[in-house]
Amino acid sequence: GLTVGKSLVEDEMMPTALVIVNMAEDAGVQLLLPTDHQVVDSYDPLNSRKTIPVEFTNTGLVGLDIGVETSARFAQALEGAKTIIWNGPMGMFEEKPFDEGTIAVAKAVA
């Protein structure tokens, strides 16, 4: 229900995402979603970046990584985990500095 600006969205996966959200809610499982992210005004990582809460994303911004608050929340949730299934990076990890979220979560897993 939030605006994601120019960020990549796989529209065909929206029904699946809603099923997952509902399943987690029905099972009483906490589903952690990002609360902040690093954004730029285009896909050019050399543009000035800023970290903003996800609810303030506007149509002109592109989210390229999770923010520091989200990285910390995810790391805390991983403490003491016995099994972790990880599918994909937290952001555009191929380009610095948008690899920071993925690195932070990887360190928490290690």
Residues of each region from the PLM?
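Active-site loop-to-helix "anion-binding N-cap" substructures in soluble metabolic enzymes
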Residues: 1-110
